Structures are given as C-alpha cells and as structure tokens.
C-alpha cells in the first residue's frame, strides 16, 4: 500500500506534494537538481492566449516572513507552452496541472480548449484572480456570480477536470467556493496570494513598480489553514491547499484542515529541494504521529469523517 497516494478527479497522485504554479516554472531548472518523477504533480506556470512579458521591474520585494510579487503572468502564450514546454514534461511520471489565466471569458475558454487537449495535461487550474477587462477590471475571483459563470464556460470546453483557484481577497471565500462548486468545478486550489504593498521610506514610493503585489510565504499560512478549514466543511469537491508551506508539519496541518493535497510555492525559492525533502520527511513524521495513511487525517480538525479518495 502506498501510504501517501491521493486520488482526485483526473489526478492519481503518488503523494500529496505539488509545486505551485508560478514558483516552479515549467520544471526545467528543477529537473537539473532532482528527478521530477518523485512529485505527486506539478502545477505549471500560467498560460494566456498570447505571450505576456509581465510587469515592469522591480517585481519582487521581501517582507517579514514572506515576499511580495507582481510578476504579471509572464509566459510564452498557450501555443508556446504546448509546443515548447509540455514536450519536456512528458518524460516524467507525475501529474501535470495546467494553470489557465486570461483577461476575458473568451480568452479563458480559448486557452482551456487548446491546452486541455494535450495528453500531458491531466487537469486545469483555473486562475480566477485576474481582472476582467469587460467588467471595469473587477477580478473574476472577487464576485461569486462572475466566478461561477467563468467556471461554467471553462468546464464546457475543457477536456480535463477543472480546479478553481480561490482568492483570499474576498468578503466570503466560503460563498466563492460554493458558487464555483455549483457551477461544476471538480476541485478547488486555495489560497492564492493576499494583496499587499511595501513602501521605500527613502523615497516614499512603493517598492514594486506595479505598486501592489501578492503576499506569499509563511506569513499567510494561518490564513490559508483557516480558509481551507472553513471551505472544507461546506463543499464536497476536493481541495488542494497552499499558502506558506515551509515544512512537513505545515503539510499535515493543511490536510487536517481539510485539504487532500498540498502545493508548495515560495519555499521553492528559499530551498529548491523542498518538495523532494517533504516527500521524504512525510512518512517519517506520519510514523512519529501514528498516522497510517495520509488521507486518514483529512478534515479531522473539525471532526469530519471523510472517506479516502
């Protein structure tokens, strides 16, 4: 028996550890360091309809217990990813999750339709934390009706299961989760970054050229755990948790809260071997805590009895 195996819609994960989108590129650099086949899955960098060059620099700023970033979805475009990036990933025995972003519902549909056809891709991660240019820049992920409609449209064209990535920058993440579940989402990934800002006191101006950025790292882990805990109690679809995971106990914490798998983001910048180390450390820590199978503890923080997927 594989004590770490997690089976989710479209995904047969040998373990629950997945590098998060935007923090692992397309795996090329990390593949020079270790065999990516050890990973449960890989969430690759976001794909948009056309190539994007990203925001002006500086794009990254350090913050206490975390970092701010405003990369701006830099990527070679969906056709560039399909032609240049996905072939490289075919050699690895791991589940590839394609992150899809856009500025209009039509762009999301187009990107999803194209990338979900590729046999390398096993699932879609729908990044709804993007501004809708047709709605005055309001983010898809901050309005339940808009998020639900986008989910429905993407589901209608996707050949693979769709996991919706939820933003914490909302009044009620529970309401958002329920809305996209009712619209047909196969799963959730959460949480995305918190919006933040840093100011250079020598100039009185924001450090980031974009002024604001997404806060990630250990500073946001308690927020992520609380939101996973709240959402897991009201949805029936699985959750891939993320937000500030730096060590093996952080992984267990998110699973206790209700996540089925855990994505690792900022920690990859601090320690490029972190995912490999977590996979090694997880069964050892489970032995110490008397945990037989990783799914035995899912949702136990709120007393739920959740069956093994």
UniProtKB/Swiss-Prot annotation:
CDD domains: DHOD_1B_like. Substrate binds at residues 45, 69-73, 127, 192-193. Catalyzes the conversion of dihydroorotate to orotate with NAD(+) as electron acceptor. GO terms for cellular component: cytoplasm. GO terms for molecular function: dihydroorotate dehydrogenase (NAD+) activity. The gene is pyrD. Heterotetramer of 2 PyrK and 2 PyrD type B subunits. Its EC number is 1.3.1.14. FMN binds at residues 21, 45-46, 99, 127, 165, 191, 217, 243-244, 265-266. The active site is at residue 130. Belongs to the dihydroorotate dehydrogenase family. Type 1 subfamily. InterPro entries: Aldolase_TIM, DHO_dehydrogenase, DHOD_1B, Dihydroorotate_DH_1, Dihydroorotate_DH_1_2, Dihydroorotate_DH_cat, Dihydroorotate_DH_CS, Dihydroorotate_DH_I. This is Dihydroorotate dehydrogenase B (NAD(+)), catalytic subunit. Keywords: Cytoplasm, Flavoprotein, FMN, NAD, Oxidoreductase, Pyrimidine biosynthesis. It comes from the Bacteria. Pathway: Pyrimidine metabolism; UMP biosynthesis via de novo pathway; orotate from (S)-dihydroorotate (NAD(+) route): step 1/1. Its cofactor is FMN.
């Amino acid at each position: 028996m594989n004590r770490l195996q997690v089976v989710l819609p479209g995904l047969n994960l040998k373990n629950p550890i997945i590098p998060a989108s935007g923090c692992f590129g397309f795996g090329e650099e990390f593949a020079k360091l270790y065999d990516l086949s050890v990973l449960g899955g890989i969430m690759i960098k976001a794909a948009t309809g056309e190539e994007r060059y990203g925001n002006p620099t500086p794009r990254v700023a350090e913050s206490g217990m975390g970092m701010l970033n405003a990369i701006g979805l830099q990527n070679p475009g969906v056709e560039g990813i399909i032609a240049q990036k996905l072939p490289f990933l075919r050699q690895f025995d791991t589940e590839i999750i394609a992150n899809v972003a856009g500025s209009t519902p039509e762009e999301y549909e187009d990107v999803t339709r194209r990338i979900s056809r590729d046999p390398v891709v096993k699932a879609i991660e729908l990044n709804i934390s993007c501004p809708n240019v047709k709605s005055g820049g309001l983010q898809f992920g901050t309005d339940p009706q808009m998020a639900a409609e986008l989910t429905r449209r993407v589901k209608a064209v996707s050949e693979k299961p769709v996991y919706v990535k939820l933003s914490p920058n909302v009044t009620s993440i529970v309401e958002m989760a329920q809305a996209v579940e009712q619209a047909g989402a196969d799963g959730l990934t959460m949480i995305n970054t918190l919006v933040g800002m840093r100011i250079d006191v020598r100039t009185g101006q924001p450090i980031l050229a974009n002024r604001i950025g997404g806060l990630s790292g250990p500073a946001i882990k308690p927020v992520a755990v609380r939101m996973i805990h709240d959402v897991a109690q009201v949805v029936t679809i699985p959750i891939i948790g993320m937000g500030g995971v730096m060590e093996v106990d952080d992984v267990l914490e998110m699973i206790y809260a209700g996540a089925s798998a855990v994505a690792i983001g900022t920690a990859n910048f601090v320690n490029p071997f972190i995912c490999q180390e977590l996979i090694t450390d997880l069964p050892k820590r489970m032995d110490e805590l008397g945990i037989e199978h990783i799914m035995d503890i899912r949702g136990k923080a709120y007393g739920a009895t959740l069956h093994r997927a």
